[in-house]
């Protein structure tokens, strides 16, 4: 049964009607529901999306895929026949719980607006057709909203993020001059992976500190994407592109900690955490450069629970010794665990003993009922995607965390396993013997992950971190020597079609 507290996932008027439709029921197009950011012109995202809830003629929600061959059909087109635009609309993703996820990616801006038709068996669904009055901007249109509060309201940003509040407790004020002196000395050596950013007048500037800064392409792309959507505060900060969090000083130390921004946190560090480059890149490149993203995984969760293989499953690199232990456990207990290493780098001498497993498509992981999540060098960045599936996640206890872990609870959203994996087999046996409880935890984890990992929420999180940081600066951010401007991708239509900008006049 779907939870009733997730307003972004279920339309409010339907919250009282969560009664499963009968097995012989048919979908009623008029009574079915459509909602989500993709039905609103102002909610600019790389991939726009919305949800469908299949409902029968008695007003009861389907809680599994509707029977029969009829499918939802969605057409997204320009309101004006004079505007010829490319819009990619794949077929709706069946989330196997009676809901569907509809995605579309715009490749040009539409000035007049969009018309979205949602059909089932030739009938319009809910309030279809939906009219999105123009302009409707595509991802690369540089047209930021000047009112951050209005932008946050459009995306339904949460009032607060617990991890952000926790991270900034250590930094009631931020001394840029102190950081300018300390960061290059402490973290900017030959092995460093630090990028120094300044955002000024919504333009982004940076300089690299250290040798290993190629991953700045990932921090660049999400900052540029954010700046195209909303006017950012002026600020100056350092992003750590490496795996491990850097600042280990305690609040009471002298000198105290400095606010380094990282993608992964740990219990013994003070870094400020942002969503990982993996989830932001997959969000930016969804339906274009990547196939596994926070949306696509929701429609590729494998067989239904009852038809999944009753084993725990793992595939991955050898980036932590416990992963090798998984393979040994698997060899000794093949009836409970299927684990394999797909690539050796850290423990190459073990390949002959443990063998090398063939690569598998990520979506095939969900053929198995239980997923083992073990750290890599730090937190395993597959974890968000595993949580969005409908398998039960067995998560290794870890000092490392991503931005959303603070919202998850053991035995409610996942089953914990000890750091040394000594209780893994015991937990697999428990899950097999308590199938309904295991299924309930898996479902609760999936629904919570759907809420926490929506693409708009990532943008909200990024903006809130930058905003909190900017509020605490005690001196004015500046463009420093050696910084270069990071240009927006070229889009000749941006200025012409952005209603918030006037074309720049050419100098005579």
Curated annotation (Swiss-Prot):
<dbReference type="InterPro" id="IPR051091">
    <property type="entry name" value="O-Glucosyltr/Glycosyltrsf_90"/>
</dbReference>
<feature type="repeat" description="Filamin">
    <location>
        <begin position="25"/>
        <end position="134"/>
    </location>
</feature>
<dbReference type="GO" id="GO:0005788">
    <property type="term" value="C:endoplasmic reticulum lumen"/>
</dbReference>
<dbReference type="GO" id="GO:0035252">
    <property type="term" value="F:UDP-xylosyltransferase activity"/>
</dbReference>
<dbReference type="InterPro" id="IPR001298">
    <property type="entry name" value="Filamin/ABP280_rpt"/>
</dbReference>
<keyword id="KW-0256">Endoplasmic reticulum</keyword>
<comment type="function">
    <text>Protein glucosyltransferase that catalyzes the transfer of glucose from UDP-glucose to a serine residue within the consensus sequence peptide C-X-N-T-X-G-S-F-X-C. Can also catalyze the transfer of xylose from UDP-xylose but less efficiently. Specifically targets extracellular EGF repeats of proteins such as NOTCH1, NOTCH3, FBN1, FBN2 and LTBP1. May regulate the transport of NOTCH1 and NOTCH3 to the plasma membrane and thereby the Notch signaling pathway.</text>
</comment>
<dbReference type="InterPro" id="IPR014756">
    <property type="entry name" value="Ig_E-set"/>
</dbReference>
<keyword id="KW-0732">Signal</keyword>
<dbReference type="InterPro" id="IPR013783">
    <property type="entry name" value="Ig-like_fold"/>
</dbReference>
<feature type="short sequence motif" description="Prevents secretion from ER">
    <location>
        <begin position="505"/>
        <end position="508"/>
    </location>
</feature>
<dbReference type="Pfam" id="PF05686">
    <property type="entry name" value="Glyco_transf_90"/>
</dbReference>
<dbReference type="GO" id="GO:0018242">
    <property type="term" value="P:protein O-linked glycosylation via serine"/>
</dbReference>
<dbReference type="Pfam" id="PF00630">
    <property type="entry name" value="Filamin"/>
</dbReference>
<dbReference type="InterPro" id="IPR006598">
    <property type="entry name" value="CAP10"/>
</dbReference>
<keyword id="KW-0328">Glycosyltransferase</keyword>
<feature type="glycosylation site" description="N-linked (GlcNAc...) asparagine">
    <location>
        <position position="307"/>
    </location>
</feature>
<dbReference type="GO" id="GO:0012505">
    <property type="term" value="C:endomembrane system"/>
</dbReference>
<protein>
    <recommendedName>
        <fullName>Protein O-glucosyltransferase 3</fullName>
        <ecNumber>2.4.1.-</ecNumber>
        <ecNumber>2.4.2.-</ecNumber>
    </recommendedName>
</protein>
<dbReference type="GO" id="GO:0035251">
    <property type="term" value="F:UDP-glucosyltransferase activity"/>
</dbReference>
<keyword id="KW-0808">Transferase</keyword>
<dbReference type="GO" id="GO:0140562">
    <property type="term" value="F:EGF-domain serine xylosyltransferase activity"/>
</dbReference>
<feature type="signal peptide">
    <location>
        <begin position="1"/>
        <end position="24"/>
    </location>
</feature>
<keyword id="KW-0325">Glycoprotein</keyword>
<dbReference type="InterPro" id="IPR017868">
    <property type="entry name" value="Filamin/ABP280_repeat-like"/>
</dbReference>
<comment type="similarity">
    <text>Belongs to the KDELC family.</text>
</comment>
<feature type="region of interest" description="Disordered">
    <location>
        <begin position="480"/>
        <end position="508"/>
    </location>
</feature>
<comment type="pathway">
    <text>Protein modification; protein glycosylation.</text>
</comment>
<dbReference type="GO" id="GO:0140561">
    <property type="term" value="F:EGF-domain serine glucosyltransferase activity"/>
</dbReference>
<dbReference type="GO" id="GO:0046527">
    <property type="term" value="F:glucosyltransferase activity"/>
</dbReference>
């Amino acid at each position: 049964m779907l939870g009733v507290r997730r307003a972004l996932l279920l339309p409010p008027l339907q919250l009282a009607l969560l009664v499963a439709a009968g097995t012989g029921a048919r979908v009623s197009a008029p009574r079915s529901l459509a909602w989500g950011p993709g039905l609103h012109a102002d909610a600019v995202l790389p991939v726009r999306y919305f949800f469908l809830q299949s409902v029968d003629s008695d007003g009861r929600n389907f809680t599994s895929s509707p029977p029969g061959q009829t499918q939802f059909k969605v057409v997204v087109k320009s309101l004006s026949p004079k505007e010829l635009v490319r819009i990619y609309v794949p077929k709706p993703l069946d989330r196997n719980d009676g809901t569907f996820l509809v995605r579309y990616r715009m490749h040009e801006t539409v000035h007049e607006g969009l018309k979205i038709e949602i059909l089932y068996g030739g009938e319009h669904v809910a309030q279809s057709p939906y009219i999105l009055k123009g302009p409707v901007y595509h991802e690369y249109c540089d047209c930021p909203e000047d009112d951050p509060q209005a932008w946050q309201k459009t995306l339904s940003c949460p009032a607060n993020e617990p991890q952000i509040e926790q991270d900034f407790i250590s930094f009631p004020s931020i001394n840029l001059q102190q950081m300018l002196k300390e960061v290059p000395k402490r973290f900017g050596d030959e092995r460093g992976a630090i990028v120094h950013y300044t955002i000024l007048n919504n333009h982004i500037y940076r300089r690299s500190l250290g040798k290993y800064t190629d991953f700045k392409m990932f921090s660049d792309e999400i900052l540029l994407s954010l700046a195209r959507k909303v006017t950012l505060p002026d600020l100056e900060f350092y992003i750590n592109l490496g795996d491990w969090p850097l600042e280990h000083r305690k609040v009471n130390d002298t000198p105290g900690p400095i606010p380094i921004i990282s993608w992964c946190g740990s219990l013994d560090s003070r870094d400020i955490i942002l969503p990982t480059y993996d989830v932001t890149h997959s969000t930016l490149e969804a339906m274009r450069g990547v196939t596994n993203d926070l949306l696509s995984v929701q429609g590729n969760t494998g067989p239904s629970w009852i038809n999944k293989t009753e084993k725990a499953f793992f595939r991955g690199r050898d980036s932590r010794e416990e992963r090798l232990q998984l393979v040994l456990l698997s060899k000794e207990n093949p009836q409970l665990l299927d684990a394999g290493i797909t690539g050796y780098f850290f423990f190459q001498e073990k390949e002959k003993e443990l063998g090398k497993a063939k690569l598998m498509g990520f979506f095939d992981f969900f053929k198995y009922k239980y997923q083992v999540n073990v750290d890599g060098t730090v937190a395993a960045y597959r974890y968000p995607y595993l949580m969005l599936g409908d398998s039960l996640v067995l998560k290794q206890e870890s000092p490392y965390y991503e931005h959303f872990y603070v919202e998850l609870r053991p035995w409610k959203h996942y089953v914990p396993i000890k750091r040394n994996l000594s209780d893994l087999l015991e937990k697999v046996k428990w899950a097999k013997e308590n199938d309904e409880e295991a299924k309930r935890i898996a479902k609760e984890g999936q629904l919570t992950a759907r809420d926490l990992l929506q693409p708009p929420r990532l943008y909200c999180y990024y903006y809130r971190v930058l905003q909190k940081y900017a509020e605490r600066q005690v001196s004015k951010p500046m463009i420093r020597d050696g910084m270069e401007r990071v240009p927006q991708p070229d889009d000749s239509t941006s200025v012409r079609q952005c209603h918030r900008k006037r074309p720049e006049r050419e100098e005579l």
